[in-house]
């Protein structure tokens, strides 16, 4: 019998500085948004609004919006969840299946419901207190992925709720919603001594390898773009940026990208330190090829899951 969720690891052996470069890139660039823009529309449960919003913010949404991973990572798309639930004598609890899930196209603000796996019925979120006919508990809330711009256009698309109530409750809380992009990394990634390791969760209802490919393709593209945009100051070293003096052959390392790339070509550098190094040894295109080969190796290793 296949389990709905399994914990696995993907391990590839790489040159240590390249493994560190990929790990740091993953942790800094692969940002899956949390549901931190939450609005409680009605609540007669025993849990206060803050408890509901905290629980909803950290719903593991990647396993629900798995068909849209690349566009969510590029922020072309966002998402929202909506819950309207009343306690009954028969149903005294709430699972993740009780939510409705919607993808948001940020160009058009269109809101489209997505299918939800029946396995979400196994993930409990809340248990109501003992049912009483005259005091049935209810909860209605909506939460948007971080970075979603709430405006009249997108609110007009929320045809499944009372817009007047939404506007009132949103105006009550919008000043305390964190304006920064709030996110988590999809996986834990480590790279001790070049052993690049991804600790992943695999679910039975979708193709994890396809999702991983979307993530790695995004990461590779973002890293290559960063490499092309990266610059090292040439001239006197002033200890504010990574810089290289061709006359003395001294390199001052002040950022992780410079450190990892020069170490790949034989330097033994550390952050905020000077090193005598011949920068003509650095071949950016060779490093990019090694990066692309490493990404292929990661995807190949995932085929063994």
Curated annotation (Swiss-Prot):
The keyword Magnesium does not apply. The keyword Transferase applies. GO terms for molecular function: DNA binding; DNA-directed RNA polymerase activity. Its EC number is 2.7.7.6. One of its GO terms (biological process) is viral transcription. Belongs to the poxviridae DNA-directed RNA polymerase 35 kDa subunit family. The DNA-dependent RNA polymerase used for intermediate and late genes expression consists of eight subunits 147 kDa, 133 kDa, 35 kDa, 30 kDa, 22 kDa, 19 kDa, 18 kDa and 7 kDa totalling more than 500 kDa in mass. The same holoenzyme, with the addition of the transcription-specificity factor RAP94, is used for early gene expression. This is DNA-directed RNA polymerase 35 kDa subunit. The gene is OPG156.
